[in-house]
Amino acid sequence: MPAGVYTAYKKDGTVYYRSSITHKNKHISLGSFSSENEAAVTYNEACEILSRSDLHIINTELHTTSYSPDMNIPFEKYIILINFRDNGIYIKTPVYLCKKFFLYFLSPDKTLIFNTDSLFYYSTHKIIARGGYYYVNDFGMQTSILSRYGIRAHSVEGRDYIFKNGDSCDYRYENICVINRYNGVSMIEKTAKNYIVLPSTSTECTRLEHMKLKMKLQLHITKLLI
């Protein structure tokens, strides 16, 4: 049996092969494979990734990697191994640590940026991309990552919140500006004046709540314009 390859059995008795590697006293699973050769190739690729920093790199400025689609090792595991090699910290999600932020690689062509304050959360929560939105499984529920910024479900970018630098992949706190934190409320511009569109007093809130909401919105808009 090749190095790093082990035989395993499914419940129905079918044979499959597991591959793993040990680096800096950390035992790392590389995945399960249908053939012994696939498992062996993956192990050899992992050895090369961990030993050849000149061949396998992550460009933190361009958010690119040297990963090739022809490689047998999954892209997610590729990022995990390079981060472990370069930063000495094993993280189970495809995260690469930088000085004041970290990169979360969803795919070879899609990378999100987060503050280091969010590292613990995203090291234990895997991000799922669906329909242009990003979610995590939190206590059995799919939760939008926008909720961590006080942005409600079904909020619209450009109306309810904006990315200050125009990069919708940059989720650092200082880059996100929440315009509207309220349900059923929107603001429109007409003849150079701001108009607040409030919920109906008879259906969505009481008259007193309606007045309080209007005052809060006016104060919030004033702060945004200062």
Give the residues covered by each predicted segment:
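Boundary-flanking segments of nucleic-acid-binding domains in nuclear regulatory proteins
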Residues: 1-226
